[in-house]
Amino acid sequence: MSSIIRSTTILPANRAAITIHTEDELNLVGEVASPKGARVASILCLHPLPTHGGMMDSHILRKAAFRLPELAGIEVIRFNTRGTTSEQGTSQGTFDFGVCEKYDVEAAIEYAFSEAKVERLWVVGWSFGTDLALKYARDPRIEGLILLSPPLRSSEPEDLLFWAADGRPITALVPEFDEFLKPAEAIVRFSAIPQIEIIAVEGAKHLWVGEPSVYRVLNEITLKVSPRKYPLPTEWSEVN
């Protein structure tokens, strides 16, 4: 018998708490949720602004960890940047407005490859996390970026020019009613990156509240990272 996948649904995965060690000697708390079956690819999630409640458990990232390992074979790596608290605990250090978070992002990427032994890694940033991705997720082993509600608040022109020259794929999901950067403006401000795909999401807002928005985001991630599992089902049966 199948059950409808709801906001509270937690599907099977191998879940483990992790500690990420930064170059400036901080310990960051996190979690890896891995498929019980074959791992197709992995995503590293960079959360929204912690001074406005952003953390590794921000709802889109939490639901990605609850669903994508089972439904799409996608391993989900989440962590709290310095000074950020969630149910998993508090990462050491103090919020640094996206400056020393460079060390957090670089350490998380290295953890993914050295400890989690990922083979295909995409970076998924949401809001503040999109600026971190554009500025610091430059490791050549990364396959591409997926940006959710990018505000382009701290990304500099040279960051965009780096990605333009680099050529790796970038997808930006921009809500129709985003409070910080709407689709038309996003097209202009991202124009320096010729390969970027900007997807205007009708009816959505910056925080992606509601199951239709969640489903759309997770589907778009799946299409890029594990396309054979697209589209995601809306129901799940324990006997698959």
Question: Where do the protein language model's features map onto the residues?
Answer:
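Acidic catalytic loop of the alpha/beta-hydrolase fold
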Residues: R153-S154, E176-L181, H206-L207
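Serine-hydrolase catalytic machinery in alpha/beta-hydrolase-like enzymes
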Residues: L26-A116
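N-terminal cap/lid segment of alpha/beta-hydrolase-fold proteins
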Residues: M1-A41
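Gly/Ala-rich beta-loop-alpha elbow adjacent to hydrolase catalytic centers
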Residues: G125-A133
